[in-house]
Amino acid sequence: MAGKVKWVTDIEKSVLINNFEKRGWVQVTENEDWNFYWMSVQTIRNVFSVETGYRLSDDQIVNHFPNHYELTRKDLMVKNIKRYRKELEKEGSPLAEKDESGKYLYLDFVPVTYMLPADYNLFVEEFRKSPSSTWIMKPCGKAQGKGIFLINKLSQIKKWSRDSKTSSFVTQSTKEAYVISLYINNPLLIGGRKFDLRLYVLVSTYRPLRCYMYKLGFCRFCTVKYTPSTSELDNMFVHLTNVAIQKHGEDYNHIHGGKWTVNNLRLYLESTRGKEVTSKLFDEIHWIIVQSLKAVAPVMNNDKHCFECYGYDIIIDDKLKPWLIEVNASPSLTSSTANDRILKYNLINDTLNIAVPNGEIPDCKWNKSPPKEVLGNYEILYDEELAQGDGAERELRSRPGQSLGPKGSRLRDAGRTVLTTWK
């Protein structure tokens, strides 16, 4: 389509604006005709609100799905994954198989989690089974480590309840909802420090599901060496990897920002644990991401004007088992280091190359499966249409940690690489 793209954003970040200007796009206000709006989650709520009566035209696209929170709100993500497991179980899917103790063999990738106040009685029952465990409490709708704390006694929850002016956990209240999850107290450590992975995943459509993994993810390290000691439960520099918290620590390094690239992690693990187990670990991480997206796909409003770049947070335990901690709808575009700035600029550049082909005025009927040469540092993680064409046999061969058979873990079809083609 002829003409220049008219853009708007309510997120004033240089990595965004520089990418728009590089393309020769024209900045306008939200009250003018626009084609591309990179917006906050608060704004997307208003845009798709029934009350506003706003309707997007065919030449407008935005960077969030209307109900992205089905994946990015901590309580709803867990709820959808639990529902997904039960549906697979009901269908008799081999993916829902359990071991003798009742644990899922292939879908056990989220720590045991309860919603508070709704699931308080269920939580107490579980807590009493293993009273020496540590649990982590998080507000459902906050980010950057805000409002998070660890507990190892029921009395701590009761105190929190009183402090929050909540009379009872048994009934629903107007107070802020929390999730409480079993704390992964045996994290893989490097240099004695806990870390997590921040991985970027772009979804162009949920039905059919098509998603892309960004190759340049990174690890975020704590500044203080890890200890499971109860005396350090309140020390968030030991337990939380969020840069928003760690940058206030005495030992925070402003040059590298306490970060490693995922490629460096891979090389480290290959040299210390071996290539085979490292490959298996990354296969399982890809598996987790695809299954989490499949879990929310049926309830996601797959609006044709939308795409979304998510920030996945994964923790690896000392047995090299990956755990999905949460998914962020607005991964930080703030640059804490020079390398960070380059990474995030390239992330936005590659995202725009897929979402707005050739930098031209968008068409909501855009080709959501672009050719490989425009992907940049993205790789196709899962393409439902290709996977369906591969038959049910792949479902049985592609469970995490198992060989994918003679085809391997990569399927090349029509010039596109599919990293994981799990059914």
UniProtKB/Swiss-Prot annotation:
Domain TTL: residue ranges: 1-367
Residue sites binding ATP per the record: K138, Q144, G145, S181, L182, Y183, I184, K194, F195, D196, T241, N242
Enzyme Commission identifier(s): 6.3.2.-
Subcellular location: Cytoplasm, Cytoskeleton; Cytoplasm, Cytoskeleton, Cilium basal body; Cytoplasm, Cytoskeleton, Cilium axoneme; Cell projection, Cilium, Flagellum
Signal peptide positions (record): none
Ranges where the record places region Disordered: 391-423
Keywords, in A-Z order: ATP-binding, Cell projection, Cilium, Cytoplasm, Cytoskeleton, Flagellum, Ligase, Magnesium, Metal-binding, Microtubule, Nucleotide-binding
Family matches, as SUPFAM superfamilies: Glutathione synthetase ATP-binding domain-like (SSF56059)
Gene Ontology biological-process annotations: protein modification process; sperm axoneme assembly
Pfam families: TTL (PF03133)
Positions bound to Mg(2+) 1: D313, E326
Keyword Ligase assigned: yes
Binding sites annotated in the UniProt record for Mg(2+) 2: E326, N328
Main location: cytoplasm
Cellular component aspect of the GO annotation: ciliary basal body; cytoplasm; microtubule; motile cilium
Catalytic activity annotation: (L-glutamyl)(n)-gamma-L-glutamyl-L-glutamyl-[protein] + L-glutamate + ATP = (L-glutamyl)(n+1)-gamma-L-glutamyl-L-glutamyl-[protein] + ADP + phosphate + H(+)
Sites where the protein binds L-glutamate: R220, K259, K344
Superkingdom: Eukaryota
UniProt-recorded Gene Ontology molecular function terms: ATP binding; metal ion binding; protein-glutamic acid ligase activity, elongating; tubulin binding; tubulin-glutamic acid ligase activity
Positions marked as site (Essential for specifying alpha-elongation versus initiation step of the polyglutamylase activity): Q144
Family the UniProt entry places it in: Belongs to the tubulin polyglutamylase family.
Domain notes: Gln-144 is the main determinant for regioselectivity, which segregates between initiases and elongases in all tubulin--tyrosine ligase family. A glutamine residue at this position is found in elongases TTLL6, TTLL9, TTLL11, TTLL13, TTLL10 and favors glutamate-chain elongation, whereas an arginine residue is found in initiases TTLL2, TTLL4, TTLL5, TTLL3, TTLL8 and favors initiation.
Subunit relationships: Part of the neuronal tubulin polyglutamylase complex which contains TPGS1, TPGS2, TTLL1, LRRC49 and NICN1. Interacts with PCM1, CSTPP1 and LRRC49.
Function: Catalytic subunit of a polyglutamylase complex which modifies tubulin, generating side chains of glutamate on the gamma-carboxyl group of specific glutamate residues within the C-terminal tail of tubulin. Probably involved in the side-chain elongation step of the polyglutamylation reaction rather than the initiation step. Modifies both alpha- and beta-tubulins with a preference for the alpha-tail.
UniProt-recorded name of the protein: Polyglutamylase complex subunit TTLL1
Organism, as annotated: Bos taurus
Taxon lineage: Eukaryota, Metazoa, Chordata, Craniata, Vertebrata
